[in-house]
Amino acid sequence: KDRITITDSLDRREVLHTQGEAGLKRVVKKEHADGSVTQSQFDAVGRLRAQTDAAGRTTEYSPDVVTGLITRITTPDGRASAFYYNHHNQLTSATGPDGLELRREYDELGRLIQETAPDGDITRYRYDNPHSDLPCATEDATGSRKTMTWSRYGQLLSFTDCSGYVTRYDHDRFGQMTAVHREEGLSQYRAYDSRGQLIAVKDTQGHETRYEYNIAGDLTAVIAPDGSRNGTQYDAWGKAVRTTQGGLTRSMEYDAAGRVIRLTSENGSHTTFRYDVLDRLIQETGFDGRTQRYHHDLTGKLIRSEDEGLVTHWHYDEADRLTHRTVKGETAERWQYDERGWLTDISHISEGHRVAVHYRYDEKGRLTGERQTVHHPQTEALLWQHETRHAYNAQGLANRCIPDSLPAVEWLTYGSGYLAGMKLGDTPLVEYTRDRLHRETLRSFGRYELTTAYTPAGQLQSQHLNSLLSDRDYTWNDNGELIRISSPRQTRSYSYSTTGRLTGVHTTAANLDIRIPYATDPAGNRLPDPELHPDSTLSMWPDNRIARDAHYLYRYDR
């Protein structure tokens, strides 16, 4: 039988045409539900040689005669990628259409010991156990070394970063991670049920988030440290149909193919979705009643979108790269690429002027310059330009930016690229001191110093400047929400609803005591201030469009 018909629950049909016998039977033609056809060609031993898409474009594959491994891929635009292997069939080199090469080296046991990225960066791998494929150390292009230790079961036990700081991992007898211990006393603990499902996560301060599941293993509830619940209900097929948080519910409906066709917000308003026979979104009608339509070509690319009469067309080159976009028949943006496929220009029209950004790269594909230009509407004469150049250090890290007519801005890094300082020309701008987690603890700029401290849970605790009036202390609740910012001049307190939305800000100072409430409808849209407008009867914006507030009226186009 050389023809197979597949019919799904929506009565959509796909037809597969096959050739060959027994183990060499292959699908050589596929008729899709929309009538489009794709084809495949195979050699005498069943290896893929070519694929032709629905638009008639062919991609060619060249397998090795002996191993069958792909050695070359040629895309419809004629550009090719090449792949090379050693006698163990391991990839040793790959060259992309842009000519850049990835290289890999292996030891006598077949383990990866060095990888050279297309931009020339080299990563090395070291092993201390001849019976393990897990590396004990890596060294990146900057020379920074990281080490790892593993259990005999292949579980990561510790990771030491480039500065010698250690993160340790604990596991239970089933191999599940039960704790992570980081520098600066930060730890996280995890608990599991008898089915191996995560049921609790606790931080160093004892704040615990719990998780509940149904019998099918779907996550049904997340209980925050303060006891508030975020629940999810599922249908018989395991798809989420309802989520509830703080008494507010959002629901989803699906068609027989499992696609979302209706989303109902907390306000009770709806967004609906329609799809074509290939499951591509073709229409969306939002909460506000606005309808957007989408059209695709035979290969699935978006080529036309309609937004209440505003028609946009999308155009591509042979490599499927976006080349220009038109709105109401007028060109809105253009994209240009060089022979390597790298983006070189992007432009648009603003008040008749052509505004563009031009990009330059080095031979490794790294951005070396970007030039902004503005041209005259009629003569195309250059009216204005500004160029910024980019430079890299010997390790390949970006470390210098040179704007037009200004000294270079240079940043100093350590390890694998952590920022340690910046300077303008030869003038130091700022220096950073970091803790064992590489978080900023001291910033020095001019005659000022900003000291930063963190809570045991890793949240920002305080920022103190040597100008005392600028000091700030931060307070958080058990759920990790910011509830207070205190400074010598004033204090601001924040309150939240059970859904986590900001409900009010209370500012106090020597001669100041202001409360600003933030009222929202169930979907989170701002409502009129209940204190300033006590007579307001508005309880929601059903279409998610705010029509007025205390100061303004808002009008929308189609």
Give names to the regions the model predicted:
Residues 1-93, 97-113, 130-134, 154, ...:
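Non-catalytic interaction/targeting regions
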